UniProtKB/Swiss-Prot annotation:
Residues the entry annotates as binding Mg(2+): D54, D94, D229
Name this protein carries in UniProt: Selenide, water dikinase
InterPro entries found in the cross-reference section: PurM-like_C_dom, PurM-like_C_sf, PurM-like_N, PurM-like_N_sf, SelD_I, SPS/SelD
Function summary: Synthesizes selenophosphate from selenide and ATP.
Pfam short name (any one): AIRS_C
PANTHER family to which the protein is assigned, alphabetical: INACTIVE SELENIDE, WATER DIKINASE-LIKE PROTEIN-RELATED, SELENIDE, WATER DIKINASE
Sorted UniProt keywords: ATP-binding, Kinase, Magnesium, Metal-binding, Nucleotide-binding, Selenium, Selenocysteine, Transferase
Gene responsible for this protein: selD
Length: 354
């Protein structure tokens, strides 16, 4: 995947207590911090933080809106180039989830004083190459010293004001499609104890570095009512936000959810990031599980790094969208997408998993 070498004198992965989006502040803690803040009234601010969406959107004119997002996190790999690629793909993903196209990016970089210069360059090169692949431009950034490495980007993109995809606009009857497997947090946690199969870990890195651009370019041709990308709040955390924001309930078929190999075994052994528990607490009693093994429950709360798009598509377009996505993705590291559930009329519980 890269021509860089892992530095034997500086272990990039072990420098991170919580790799990737596992370091993200929990959704519950974030809600508590922001609840007393109000967004300044501006008619051109089309999407703010009130619905916990993927990015902010500001209307420039009748044909153009600016999408603005930011993401950075600790290392997910001992290979600096792979870390740079995954961090960049994760940062770009919010633009795609909103239905937009990325254009400009700024590096956000925390380095330690003992990091080798070649390693720093490789992280930046990984990020630069991935942004270039996306058709966008890295045009600057900001770098500081810190106790542990962190990298990501602030990204700006554009979308037509009437074609914005939000996470809080799902409709009753929508079909839910997921474009990447879940389990990155558990897989990365197990890898720190050398308990993840090397071939599956390599596949995970390739999938995390895979842009959601292809899925975005296909889905915008169909009637999509809502979309988000699966990251730090886990599959069920993001589904909960979608259901709550949309005033709907959501039914999930857990056996249809695509997963990485070995993650169930790791979950059964308790090899999970702390985010699994904070995400479960965030959803609270707004969910009911029907005959779902505990390990699968934990897996669906697992914080994801550079996860797939969760697409809420009108039922009339679902079959055609699924077919086109399948043809486009089945020969990529991601493999075929999966239909994982349905949006239903709001009932007592927001989420029902069976």
């Amino acid at each position: 995947m890269s021509c860089s070498l892992i530095n034997e004198d500086f272990d990039l992965l072990k420098a991170a207590k919580n790799p990737g989006u596992g370091a993200k502040l929990s959704a519950g803690a974030l809600d508590k911090l922001l609840k007393n803040f109000s967004v300044r009234n501006d008619d051109n601010l089309l999407v703010g933080f009130n619905t916990s969406d993927d990015a902010a959107v500001y209307k420039i004119n009748d044909k153009t809106a600016l999408i603005s997002t930011i993401d950075f996190f600790p290392p997910v790999s001992g290979d600096p180039y792979i870390f740079g690629q995954v961090a960049a793909a994760n940062s770009l993903s919010d633009i795609y989830a909103m239905g937009g196209e990325p254009k400009l990016a700024l590096n956000l970089f925390c380095i330690t004083k003992d990091m080798p210069e070649d390693m720093i360059k490789e992280i930046l090169r990984g990020g630069f190459d991935k942004v270039y692949e996306a058709g966008a431009i890295v045009c600057g950034g900001h770098t500081i010293y810190d106790d542990s490495p962190k990298y990501g980007l602030a990204v700006n993109g554009f979308v037509h004001p009437k074609k914005i995809l939000e996470n809080s606009t799902a409709k009753e009857g929508d079909v839910l499609i997921l474009t990447k497997p879940i389990g990155t947090g558990i897989l990365l946690t197990a890898s720190k104890a050398d308990m993840s199969p090397p071939e599956e870990l390599d596949r995970c890195y390739k999938i995390m570095a895979f842009l959601n651009a292809k899925a975005r370019n296909i889905m915008v041709k169909y009637k999509i009512n809502a979309c988000t990308d699966i990251t730090g709040f886990g599959l069920l955390g993001h589904l909960y936000e979608m259901g709550k924001g949309s005033g709907m309930s959501i039914e999930v078929d857990y056996k249809s959810v695509p997963i990485y190999k070995s993650v169930i075994e790791s979950a059964e052994m308790g090899m999970m990031p702390a985010g699994v528990y904070s995400n479960r607490n965030f959803v609270g009693d707004n969910i009911v599980f029907e005959n779902v093994p505990l390990a699968y429950q934990d897996l669906m709360f697992d914080p994801q790094t550079s996860g797939g798009l969760l697409i809420s598509v009108d039922k009339e377009d679902a079959a055609a969208l699924y077919e086109e996505l399948s043809q486009a993705l089945e020969n990529t590291p991601c493999g075929k997408p999966a239909i994982i559930g349905l949006v239903t009329k709001r009932d007592e519980k927001i989420l029902r998993v069976s």
